Amino acid sequence: MARTLYEKLFDAHVVYEASNETPLLYIDRHLVHEVTSPQAFDGLRAHNRQVRQPGKTFATMDHNVSTQTKDINASGEMARIQMQELIKNCNAFGVELYDLNHPFQGIVHVMGPEQGITLPGMTIVCGDSHTATHGAFGALAFGIGTSEVEHVLATQTLKQGRAKTMKIEVKGHAAPGITAKDIVLAIIGKTGSAGGTGHVVEFCGDAIRALSMEGRMTLCNMAIEMGAKAGLVAPDDITFNYVKGRLHAPKGNDFDDAVEYWKTLQTDEGATFDTVVTLQAEEIAPQVTWGTNPGQVISVNDNVPDPASFADPVERASAEKALAYMGLKPGIPLTEVAIDKVFIGSCTNSRIEDLRAAAEIAKGRKVAPGVQALVVPGSGPVKAQAEAEGLDKIFIEAGFEWRLPGCSMCLAMNNDRLNPGERCASTSNRNFEGRQGRGGRTHLVSPAMAAAAAVTGHFADIRVLK
């Protein structure tokens, strides 16, 4: 029987499945950070349990860390406690930790792939909703809650029901300057922020195959923003070349053997999906969100929509509420909307390719008066690579702030946040009310679009930027 990639991955990891019961899956990799793990480790202690397979568990600090200093106290008391607990727990249970002073420290979904912890064919979990990022490698990766974190630590397994399947095909080839971020925002604009609910999404088509691994990670990172459980891209030579030689990747003959298996991780011809969505890449322009969920998105050269134009009464009410919160009036061109802050970073867009794209726009220009612009590399290795290429100098010369790795302004859990009423062009993944700080107004864009907003002081179409 023909199977989808998701079905192959799921079936390969079923440990036990009784009649009328939820299947038990084996988990190949468990990624841990400071926010969702303390209670899980406490649960192990309370029941006198050990971490079942510490060699398959990897921890880092990212959500709470300061991006201005490596001082554990810099982000406040709660952040300090959570980071100290992570140090204590990793020491006690034998889990490898990339702490603030480790060269590999960074955002968990950046760190995993670049160290070869993430590999095709794996099941990967983390107490973080954007774990879907790792699906870019043809791995089944999804976020879990704290009680599930404890269960995986204790057993290396997790009960999971089978999801529906969705195929999203992006046909043709994207125009120059159109990035994975634009593609995924256009997809969510079509499906809506709940269009993928109950599904695992496989992204395919010529436009997806043309993406680098960084681009595919951006794509899968935001699968959760359409309500999906996970996102997948079938592995290919681009995947294998990215993985080869990384710290935790197989070596020598083992790598060659692994590639032979990884090549089987494709959806079979004739396999059926529950839902199919199709887009034409040529029709995708640079995207900017205007509302308070990622599905409220338009092309940069469009005008802010009028709620009256929505036929669905729920969508109309949502649009009215979003515009009121965002302080926008229907009909105004997006390119006339001024911004206060720019954030280039997050697990969506903080990899070296993202920083190169932003630096290309920033080079020879200056951040507009009154705008604060932050560039936050996703990890220590990304920061080191960017500095080796001189990207930090380009940003600093243009007036951007060059920061230390961390989740930063993606979420208001550290010192990088918006003040009430401030408007931000952000390369992150969520634009909910208060996501970047109470009363903050978030517009999701690509790194190049964020840099363009920084140097012009408003949203600008990078295709015509002089």
From Swiss-Prot:
Q: What class of enzyme is it?
A: lyase
Q: Which InterPro entries match?
A: 3-IsopropMal_deHydase_lsu (IPR004430), Acnase/IPM_dHydase_lsu_aba_1/3 (IPR015931), Acoase/IPM_deHydtase_lsu_aba (IPR001030), Aconitase_4Fe-4S_BS (IPR018136), Aconitase_4Fe-4S_dom (IPR036008), IPM_dehydratase_rel_enz (IPR050067), IPMI_cat (IPR033941)
Q: Which pathway is it part of?
A: Amino-acid biosynthesis; L-leucine biosynthesis; L-leucine from 3-methyl-2-oxobutanoate: step 2/4
EC number, UniProt record:
4.2.1.33
A Pfam family that the UniProt record links to this protein: Aconitase
Select a single GO molecular function from the record's annotations and give it.
metal ion binding
Q: What are its cofactors?
A: [4Fe-4S] cluster
Q: Where does [4Fe-4S] cluster bind?
A: C347, C407, C410
The signal sequence is: none
Q: Name one GO biological process term.
A: L-leucine biosynthetic process
Q: Which reaction does it catalyse?
A: (2R,3S)-3-isopropylmalate = (2S)-2-isopropylmalate
Free-text cofactor note: Binds 1 [4Fe-4S] cluster per subunit.
Keywords assigned: 4Fe-4S, Amino-acid biosynthesis, Branched-chain amino acid biosynthesis, Iron, Iron-sulfur, Leucine biosynthesis, Lyase, Metal-binding
Task performed by this protein: Catalyzes the isomerization between 2-isopropylmalate and 3-isopropylmalate, via the formation of 2-isopropylmaleate.
**Which PANTHER family does the UniProt entry name for this protein?**
3-ISOPROPYLMALATE DEHYDRATASE, HOMOACONITASE, MITOCHONDRIAL-RELATED
Q: How does it assemble?
A: Heterodimer of LeuC and LeuD.
Among HAMAP family, the record links this protein to: LeuC_type1
Family recorded in the similarity comment: Belongs to the aconitase/IPM isomerase family. LeuC type 1 subfamily.
What this protein is called in its record is 3-isopropylmalate dehydratase large subunit
